[in-house]
A protein has these predicted regions:
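Solvent-exposed, conformationally flexible loop/turn segments
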Residues: 12-14
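N-terminal Sec-dependent signal peptide, specifically the hydrophobic helical h-region
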Residues: 1-9, 62
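Generic preference for hydrophobic/aromatic residues in regular secondary structure cores
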Residues: 2, 43-47, 68
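Flexible inter-domain hinge/linker segments at boundaries of tandem extracellular adhesion modules
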Residues: 1-4, 37-39, 103-106
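A short beta-strand segment in extracellular, disulfide-stabilized domains
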Residues: 17-22
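Ligand-binding face of N-terminal immunoglobulin V-set domains in extracellular IgSF glycoproteins
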Residues: 16, 61-106
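N-terminal V-set
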Residues: 23-63, 100
Length: 106
């Protein structure tokens, strides 16, 4: 039985943070999704097969607008200009394998 990782991340308001996928490169059939804990909202996605990278930064009243950057090689997610609205749990799903990040904003 494999338990998902839950990685605590501390960041100061106004700073940027990168949530690392720990991938060095993506494979041809990789699908990577980042979700925010409120309603399990999809905020970013890479579908290698479809050659598509998408950030959904208008969700949740636009709290992520112009703040999300997705690394096309590793799938890591950077959130810029952090506010307390970004506090909480983020789920990284790579081909159905889940890891979690808990973001603490001060």
């Amino acid at each position: 039985l494999i338990f998902p990782l839950e990685i605590p991340v501390t960041v100061w308001e106004g700073d940027s943070v990168t949530l690392n996928s720990d991938l060095t490169e993506m494979k041809d059939d990789d699908v990577i999704q980042w979700r925010f804990w409120i309603e399990n909202t999809l905020i970013a996605e890479i579908n290698v097969t479809a050659d598509r990278i998408t950030v959904y930064d208008d969700v949740l009243d636009g709290r992520f607008r112009d703040r999300l950057k997705l690394d096309k090689q590793t799938g890591s997610l950077t959130i810029t200009n952090i506010t307390t609205e970004h506090d909480g749990e983020y789920k990284l799903e790579i081909n159905s394998v889940e890891n979690f990040f808990i973001l603490f904003v001060f």
